[in-house]
């Protein structure tokens, strides 16, 4: 009696939860993903609305997306690699800036929050807060943005006082955080649908 076996299809890069399936990839592939992630973060930093003392950028969107796409461990590593590039002077921060001075200035608290944001979004993704549950995906990104504003605001308060920190470093970014969280969740849903279409072919 003969048996026929259909060839197993290799898993795609994008999973049905809208995340990248990097765990089973080679070390070289994951290292390349980290490099691409830092480029994505640098590009997002260039999308800027100048404000004083903290500019509006797409950094938090990119950070949350890296956490959601890469997962907690690799996502956090990617953010740390990007911040390392900034520390040695590469022009990867808002407005093409770089250097250690930015970690001690008004934006220091926000920069410090980015690895924690990626860790939070990635950890929640691994617990089902992903594209298959869009509202939870949105909530995870919103929580990460709130964490960023809290850490950034606390740092800024130490430099310019609590009232000014809230007025200049927190309040102007609340609506943007909500919108970027919605955009992030929608992007994950779109990637999830793309993966399903690929599986159907």
Where are these regions (language model features)?
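Hydrophobic transmembrane alpha-helices
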Residues: 2-76
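Generic alpha-helical transmembrane segments of integral inner-membrane proteins
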Residues: 35, 39, 43, 65, ...
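Alpha-helical transmembrane segments and their cytosolic interface
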Residues: 1-35, 168-201
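Hydrophobic alpha-helical transmembrane segments
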Residues: 31-35, 61-65, 75-81, 107-112, ...
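Short helix-perturbing small/polar motifs within transmembrane alpha-helices
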Residues: 3-22, 29, 43, 100-148
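Membrane-embedded alpha-helical hairpins and interfacial helices in multi-pass inner-membrane proteins
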Residues: 128-201
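Short helix-capping/hinge motifs at transmembrane helix termini and TM-loop junctions
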Residues: 45-48, 52, 89, 94-97, ...
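Alpha-helical membrane segments and adjacent membrane-interface helices in multi-pass membrane proteins
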Residues: 48-120
């Amino acid at each position: 009696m003969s048996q026929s076996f259909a060839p197993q299809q290799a898993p795609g890069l994008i999973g049905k939860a809208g995340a990248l399936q990097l765990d089973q990839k080679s070390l070289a592939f994951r290292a390349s993903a980290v490099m691409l992630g830092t480029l994505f973060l640098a590009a997002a930093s260039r999308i800027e609305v100048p404000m004083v003392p903290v500019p509006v950028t797409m950094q938090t969107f990119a950070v949350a997306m890296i956490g959601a796409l890469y997962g907690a461990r690799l996502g956090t590593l990617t953010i740390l690699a990007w911040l390392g590039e900034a520390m040695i002077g590469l022009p990867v921060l808002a407005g093409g800036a770089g250097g250690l001075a930015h970690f001690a200035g008004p934006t220091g608290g926000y920069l410090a929050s980015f690895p924690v944001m990626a860790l939070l979004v990635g950890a929640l993704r691994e617990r089902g807060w992903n594209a298959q549950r869009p509202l939870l995906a949105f909530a995870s990104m919103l929580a990460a943005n709130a964490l960023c504003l809290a850490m950034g605001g606390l740092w800024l308060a130490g430099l310019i006082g609590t009232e000014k920190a809230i007025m200049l470093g927190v309040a102007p970014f609340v609506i943007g955080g909500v919108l970027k969280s919605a955009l992030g969740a929608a992007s994950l849903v779109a990637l999830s649908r793309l993966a399903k279409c690929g599986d159907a072919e």
